[in-house]
Every structure is written in C-alpha cells, then in structure tokens.
C-alpha cells in the first residue's frame, strides 16, 4: 500500500483519531489508572484483559495477544481491509483521501464508491418524490397499515413502471442517466429500451452505518410483477451478506441497543417499529451469514431471532443457531421467538398489539432451550441407538462454542438427557483442552538491545535524548541498525506515538519484531524509563568502544599501531575508565 495512500495522510488520520473514543463506539471501556480496560472482543475473555492506552494510542490483550493501533482495530473488529479502514476513519473525520498518482487502482475504487453513494442518494430522493404522486403505491402501503411517519422515517419510495415517463416527470438529465446505466442501477433490454430494475415496486433504501444509501430492496405491488422481492445487484458499496436493514435507524435512536430483534423482511421491520417495538432489524431474508452474526454482536450482547411461522422460518432459525454457535460467549447470547403457524411479525403485531408482542420478546427461548427443543425432535430416548445418534449429532455442534461455561452446561444437559449421571462416565463429554497461544513475550530473550528498542517504540519521545548517532554508525552490533532506523523516524516525527510509529512500518520487514517489542513487558517503572534508556545507550556505546579496543590491541600484537591508532586507543581507554 506504500505509495498509494500517502503516509502523511495516514499519520494525520491517526493523529486526529482518539483510539479510546473509537473503540468505545464499539465496546464499553472502563478506566483503570491511566489506561482503559474491558473484556477482549477477539476471544472468550473471562476477566478484562483488553487494555487501551490513550497515551500510546495502542491496544493490547494480555489473553490472546491481539494488539495494534486504530487502523488495526477496525481491520480486526469491523472485518475491513486496510483501505476500507482508512476510508472508515476518513469518513468519521469528514476528510477525503488524497491518493497519490501511483495509487490508481485504489483511487478508482474510492472514486467509484463516492459516485455510487451520490447516485444511490439521488435515486432514493426521486423514488421518495415519486411515491407522493403514485396512488397505487400509497394505496398498497395504506392496506399494509404503514403510516406516513414510517414512510418518511425509512425513506420509502416507488419506482414507476416505465422509465421514460419517470425520467420525464423528474427531468432526469442524459449524463445522469448514463451514470445510472454505467453503474447498473438501471438497465437496457435486448431492444435497447431502458428500464429500472425496481419498476412497479415499492423501494426500500438500505443504509450503511453512516446513513449513506448503499442499495435498494423492492417489493412488487401487483401479482403480475415477479419476483415479488428484489434486491440491488452487489457492487463496491453493497454486499448483501454483510448488511443489516434497519440497523442505521435503530442506532439513530439507541447508540447502544440492549438487544436486536432480527426479522425476515422490510415490512416486518417497519410494522414492528410503527407499533413501538424497539431494536428491530432484518438480515435481508432468511439467509443469515457469519458476517451478519458478527455485525449484530458488535452492536449488542443479545440477538433475538423472530422468523416467520412456517417451515422456511423454522428451518432458518435452526440454520441461524448453527452459524451463530462459534460466536456465542459468556457475554454474547442469542434467543428465538417461535411464531404460530402461518404468522409473521407483520401479521401477528396487528392481531396482538404491542404489549402481547413485547411479552413474546421477554419470553423468547434461550439458546439452550431452543437447541434441545429442536435436536430432540423425533428422538426416542428409550432407544440406545437413538441416544447414541443424538450424542453424535449434538456434540459436534456443542463443541463449536468457545465458552467453556456454556459448552459444559450444554454437555451436562445432554448427558442427563441420555441418562449419564456419573461424573466418570461424563468425562467423555467434557470439553477438549483449549489451546492457549503462548504469549509472544516469552518467545524472545531479554537483551539490552531489544530492551532499548522496546523502550523507544513504547516511548517515541525518548528520541529527543539522543543528540547525535554518528558514534553508532557503521558498527556491527545485532539489532543496532533497527534501533538507529527507528530513532531517526522518531526524531523526524517528534509527535509520533506508538500507534503511529507501528503504522509507519506496517509494510516493512521489521514490523513483526516491532509489534512484539511494542507490547513487551520490560518491567521498568515509568519514573525510571528515561534513566534506563540512557544507561542502555551508554552501555551500547561502551560495547562499541570495547570491540574497537580489542581490535586495536590484536593489531598491536601482530604488526603494531600507527600514531593515530595509538592516540585512538588512548582515548578509548580514557572513555572506558569513566564507565
């Protein structure tokens, strides 16, 4: 990426970003001394081991060794690539990315995204204007019970049956039409006739977390337009498997929702919201993905699924459970609402009203109850064969859960269900030993040079204590070139913190050792760091003098020294005597 997004811009982004505030938009932090702590979002953390340093603009987990700066956090937590994480920070700070001339591919993608945002927004406004003048669309929404407040809140629109009439009505320019065709927002048939993909449909805009419109969903209002439901084609800003409909609207009202209620369709979301059921979203159908699960858990600790009361809905609930199991933890849980046959959230809220539906939410089945309710279907517990097949089917699913507590709890229920009550017999159901990564800090030896580099990485302002490096140049001491390289970078960038320093070296050959040393516990108290750094620097210089002294002494024994060399060894002896 070097040479594509300028390093000065990346550094400026990190300088503007407060990593504590950024992480707190995703997870709750608690102040602990000068740092902030919480349970690690990257592994099943029983005690808070995730530390965020405002001073260093750096995070580190003592449990799983996850670490990095603001960019790394977005890459790992939001599942973004490097460029996407830069785009996210740039959006937060409302600044454009100044791609340089070498970054042609990235720049084209970035500009294409900006163009798509613009086109989607403009089309959405046209759809919204159009619905005002379309009696059939208004009649349909009225029959579905959707009021004007919801139409406005969710920016609902309508696409006319004929593009030429639509374009004339709103005076759409040819250049705009060409852009829409180029980005496949509208299309042409084999006869060259332009048509809107969503023609004859109610249009539901889909927003990203920043409120930008990234795609549309359409619902036909007559039986002769098929398919009944339609989504935009995937593009650079829209990936169906990663989007949650209604999440932006929920977050507008509740920055940290206590739960999220997942339903199947747009109208389910809208109707429940209209009836004052909070926190409702949709995964754009029943095809839930692991990305959906991860996104939902980033915004809340409890996700409740409420699919339609038919075979497709029940199958979707079971499929969702299986996909979600690896992401369940002691703090992240899922629940299920099972609706009566042939009911969906839209129909049942109209029959029952808000209070009764809220009771369904309050009494939603826990994950464990739903799991055993489904897995015990058609199982004859009086049959040893059935009990065996039950355990064969259940155990692999239970083993997907990372939480020891939940996994053991489910195994105990399974053991009791199949009639195993003796602890010794139950051993075969106990969890496999969890492999814990050996902390990187124990994989490398403590050496003076590594401590020197580690202190500098963790405290870049120490560079101001070194007025000159001439006496260290051209010396062959292991690690010294790395130290001098970092020292120069810190001197050239006096305001760098640890996070910015690591970002500077993201694509260099030394980044791995720098990452290790950035989180290395050197066990030196803060008040003594400066003196320790200077002592190590002095000792390094002494080591250089000693090596030169040995070389001159060896030469003297073999062939003697020149006058200049004799003066040099005298000077070295004098300096070393002052140690």
From Swiss-Prot:
Cofactor comment:
Binds 1 zinc ion per monomer. Binds two Mg(2+) per subunit.
The record's listing under SUPFAM superfamilies reads: DNA primase core (SSF56731), DNA primase DnaG, C-terminal domain (SSF117023), Zinc beta-ribbon (SSF57783)
Cofactor(s) the protein needs = Zn(2+); Mg(2+)
InterPro entries xrefs: DNA_helicase_N/primase_C, DNA_primase_core_N_sf, DNA_primase_DnaB-bd, DNA_primase_DnaG, DNA_primase_DnaG_DnaB-bd_dom, DNA_primase_Znf_CHC2, DnaG_bac, DNAG_N
From the UniProt record, give one GO term of the biological process aspect: DNA replication, synthesis of primer
What are the protein's UniProt keywords? DNA replication, DNA-binding, DNA-directed RNA polymerase, Magnesium, Metal-binding, Nucleotidyltransferase, Primosome, Transcription, Transferase, Zinc, Zinc-finger
EC number, as in UniProt: 2.7.7.101
Residues bound to Mg(2+) 1 are 264, 308
The kind of enzyme this is, by top-level EC class, is: transferase
The record places domain Toprim at 258-340
Top-level taxon in the UniProt lineage: Bacteria
Q: Where are the zinc fingers (CHC2-type)?
A: 40-64
The UniProt record gives the binding positions of Mg(2+) 2 as 308, 310
Reaction(s) catalysed by this chain, per the record, are: ssDNA + n NTP = ssDNA/pppN(pN)n-1 hybrid + (n-1) diphosphate
Please give the GO cellular component terms listed in this UniProt entry.
Answer: cytoplasm; DNA-directed RNA polymerase complex; primosome complex
From the Swiss-Prot or TrEMBL record, what is one GO molecular function term?
zinc ion binding
Q: Which family does it belong to?
A: Belongs to the DnaG primase family.
Q: How does this polypeptide assemble, per the annotation?
A: Monomer. Interacts with DnaB.
Comment, domains: Contains an N-terminal zinc-binding domain, a central core domain that contains the primase activity, and a C-terminal DnaB-binding domain.
What exactly does this protein do? RNA polymerase that catalyzes the synthesis of short RNA molecules used as primers for DNA polymerase during DNA replication.
Protein's recorded name: DNA primase
